[in-house]
């Protein structure tokens, strides 16, 4: 840096310091002089303070209203995207000591077979799984024999058809996914084997979905080929209402209302998704009983056996 530039920087710095000192002295002198408008200033300050308080109150109210509107908008958009939150129904098999209603499972299988099986598959369920749960072995064999299964190859290397057996899975309604989408306007009917586990709040969701069809509210337009259902994400579903009063004639004579059919088919689907539930609960109680006995035995030995050994003192008597 040149000498002239250093000198200019020094003068600039000195000038700034001088202006700062002069300004501070002037402010101190002004503060000592009495003002002619003190009363007016005091009144204006009070008015400004009241106005600022009112402004802050209005700002707080506006922020609260804006927050409520934002929350309502977010809740509405979330409801439209994910569907309504399903109510909780008192399913009889959800208790700790409860088991499945096997009569309801049998009726639910009847509803699935006559209403749902034309579009939805249950690829993980075999006919033998129904034995002892909803049907006897003879009834299940007769039911399986009603279907035809493509098997093979035979000794000549050709495929053949045969009557169904207990080891066969439930038949598929469509040959492949493309055929299923073509038959349902582009929508793919999901497999129902694990549907109550694959959906959030599964049992309640399936029941609410099956029984909540209604006309769309004012201002909501549904594309042709879709149906309004508030519990389905987006509110528009390709599946029409399938459960109508009297759609199925139960073998035990119970009236087949919409709610009854929905309850029964959900019981059947819950069993299909978790057939080991009853065995798991029973095994849990067995383990609790065994571990309780082990805990009591450990407490006994800890209190009456080990405490004696733990508190024992050994005295070493050294004989000279």
UniProtKB/Swiss-Prot annotation:
SUPFAM superfamilies from the UniProt entry: Cytochrome c, Cytochrome c1 subunit of cytochrome bc1 complex (Ubiquinol-cytochrome c reductase), transmembrane anchor
- Principal place where this protein is found? mitochondrion
Q: Which residues lie on this side of the membrane: Mitochondrial matrix?
A: 302-320
Cite the binding residues for heme c: 116, 119-120, 239
Q: Which cofactor does it need?
A: heme c
Give the protein family: Belongs to the cytochrome c family.
Question: What protein does this entry describe?
Answer: Cytochrome c1-1, heme protein, mitochondrial
From which organism does this entry originate? Solanum tuberosum
């Amino acid at each position: 840096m040149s000498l002239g530039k250093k000198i200019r920087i020094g003068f600039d710095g000195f000038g700034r310091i001088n202006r700062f000192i002069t300004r501070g002295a002037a402010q101190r002198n002004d503060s000592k002089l009495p003002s002619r408008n003190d009363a007016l200033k005091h009144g204006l300050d009070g008015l400004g303070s009241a106005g600022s308080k009112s402004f802050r109150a209005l700002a707080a109210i506006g922020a609260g209203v804006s927050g409520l509107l934002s929350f309502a908008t977010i809740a509405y958009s979330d409801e439209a995207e994910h569907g309504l939150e399903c109510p909780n129904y008192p399913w009889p098999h959800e208790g700790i000591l409860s088991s499945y209603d096997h009569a309801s499972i049998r009726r639910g299988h009847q509803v699935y077979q006559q209403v749902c099986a034309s579009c939805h598959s249950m690829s993980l369920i075999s006919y033998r799984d129904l034995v002892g749960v909803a049907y006897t072995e003879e009834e299940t064999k007769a039911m399986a024999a009603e279907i035809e299964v493509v098997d093979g190859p035979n000794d000549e290397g050709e495929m053949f058809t045969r009557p169904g057996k207990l080891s066969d899975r439930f038949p598929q309604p469509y040959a492949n996914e493309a055929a299923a989408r073509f038959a349902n306007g582009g929508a793919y009917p999901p497999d129902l084997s694990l549907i109550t586990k694959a959906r959030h709040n599964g049992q309640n969701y399936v029941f609410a979905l099956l029984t909540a069809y209604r006309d769309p509210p004012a201002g909501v337009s549904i594309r042709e080929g879709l149906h309004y259902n508030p519990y389905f994400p987006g509110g528009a579903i390709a599946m029409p209402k399938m459960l109508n009063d009297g759609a199925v004639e139960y073998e035990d004579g119970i009236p087949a209302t919409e709610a009854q059919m929905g309850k029964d088919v959900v019981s059947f689907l819950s069993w299909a998704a978790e057939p080991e539930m009853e065995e798991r609960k029973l095994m849990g109680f067995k383990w609790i009983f065994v571990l309780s006995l082990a805990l009591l035995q450990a407490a006994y030995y800890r209190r009456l056996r080990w405490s004696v050994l733990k508190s024992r003192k050994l005295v070493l008597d050294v004989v000279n």
